[in-house]
Each structure stands twice: as C-alpha cells, then as structure tokens.
Amino acid sequence: MTVPNHQQDISDSDLESRPSKTRLKQEMHALQVLGERLVELEPARITELDLPEKLTDALLEARRITSHGARRRQMQFIGKLMRAIDPVPVQEKLDAWQHSSLKHTAWLHQLERWRDRLISDEAAVTEFVQSYPQTDVRQLRTLLRNVEKEKLANKPPKSFRALFQLLRQIIPEISA
C-alpha cells in the first residue's frame, strides 16, 4: 500500500512561477494600505480617480463608518476590490496630489518667511524689491508701518494679514 505524495503532483516549475503565500499577503496588505489612503481623501477626489463604481461606493461608505470592527471589515472589503484594479495609476495620482500639496505648503512658508523678514528688518524691503521688481513699494511700506502701529496699539492684525495677501499676489506660486 502506497501513500500518495502530493508533493510529487506539483512540478518544480509551478512552484517557481507562483508567488509565495507570504508575498501574496504582503501585496494584499499593500492594497489595503492604499485603500486606507483613498478613504482619507475628500469625496470629490475619490470620484476624480475613475475607479470602478463598486470600489468608489465602498470607499465613500468607509468614510461614513465609525465603528472600529465594521470599519476594519470594510477596509478588508476595499482591499479585496482593489485586487481587481491596477494600483499603479492610483498610487501615482495620490503621489502627485501629495507632491502638489507639499509644494503649495512650501510656497506658503516662503511667504511667511518674507513677511516676518520684512517686518523685522528694514534692509529686507530693499532686497525684496530687488527680487520682485513689480512690487508697489509705497503700498508695501504703508502696510509695514500699519503692522507696527497695530502691534504697538494691541489691535487685531489686520495689516499683518493684508501684508500676507499682498505677498501672495507678488510672489508666484511654485509650479510643477
């Protein structure tokens, strides 16, 4: 009496061609993490991604769910639906949006640094006007004087905000 050996039924080429169980689990987990990133997006962004309707509905539903267990199950379901699509274009679109957001934030920080330098250092005004010759120097100096007056009088920072808005108009946003 011989005992069937299941290992003999599977050829070596079959074993090499299919991914390991661990590899499959890693890929499924990566899809679920991508799904979590998608759930965090605004609904308008989700619809921009041109995903299958069932996946879009599942993502929007996951945003609504607050129960931990139900949300976990929904995320697993989203991971399952993600297996049917090519995740590369979705990942690229998310990365592009994030990169765009980072550039916008860097631009805003640049504006804040200029505003702080202009307020604290009189020589910075000359440097700013040289860097951005389209600047209305009279308006800039007026706003800087008003910022100082408001600060001394403990008034709300109306001119402080107006100075920032002026800088937004003058300094171009960093483009892609």
Curated annotation (Swiss-Prot):
Q: Name one GO molecular function term.
A: ribosome binding
Biological role: Member of a network of 50S ribosomal subunit biogenesis factors which assembles along the 30S-50S interface, preventing incorrect 23S rRNA structures from forming. Promotes peptidyl transferase center (PTC) maturation.
* NCBIfam families for this protein: PRK05255.1-1
Q: Please give the name of this protein.
A: Dual-action ribosomal maturation protein DarP
The organism's superkingdom is given as Bacteria
Region (Disordered), start-end ranges: 1-22
From which source organism is this entry? Nitrosomonas eutropha (strain DSM 101675 / C91 / Nm57)
Q: Where in the cell is it found?
A: Cytoplasm
Key words, A-Z? Cytoplasm, Ribosome biogenesis, RNA-binding, rRNA-binding
* Similarity section: Belongs to the DarP family.
**Polar residues: bias regions:** 1-10
State the Pfam families in the record. DarP
Name one process (GO BP) from the record.
Answer: assembly of large subunit precursor of preribosome
Q: Show the GO cellular component annotation of the record.
A: cytosol
